[in-house]
Amino acid sequence: MERVERIIEFEIARINSHLPRARKSLKDLLNMEEPMITLRDGSVHYFKRQELELLASLLDEEEIAMLRLPMVLEISTVERDKIIIRGKVEAKVIRKILGFEEAIIEEPILKLPRYYLPKIRRILPTTTVHAFIVEW
C-alpha cells in the first residue's frame, strides 16, 4: 500500500504545480508595478490590479498587510463536498465577497459547500487558487 500512497502523493503534487512557491501580502502586491508571484512549476502568475484594489477596499490597513495572496481554496479528499479557507483575514474576505453577514467571532477556518467554488473563482480569478489536499 505504501507504493500506491507515494504514487497518489506524486500525482497530487503534479496537479498542484499551479500553486505559489510563496505567497505575498496584499500590501506588497499593491506596491508592485506588476503584481506577480512565481509558481511551483516555475511559471509566473500575475494579479489583476482591479482585484487587489477590491480586496483592499474590504479591509483595514492591518488586514491589508496580513492578507496573503493568492488565497488558497482547499479541496480535501475527506470533506469532498466542502472547500476550506484558512486564515481569519482570508475567511473575512470570502464572507464579504459572497455577501454573508459579518461574523461575531472571526474564525481562522471557513468551510463552505463546494458549490461556492465557481462563484468565488469568478469574482476573484487571479487572487484565489484551488488546491487538492490528500488526507488519509
Swiss-Prot record:
InterPro entries attached to this UniProt entry: UPF0216
Pfam families according to UniProt: DUF61
Family as reported in the entry's similarity comment: Belongs to the UPF0216 family.
NCBIfam families given in the database record: PRK04115.1
Protein name: UPF0216 protein PYRAB16100
Organism: Pyrococcus abyssi (strain GE5 / Orsay)
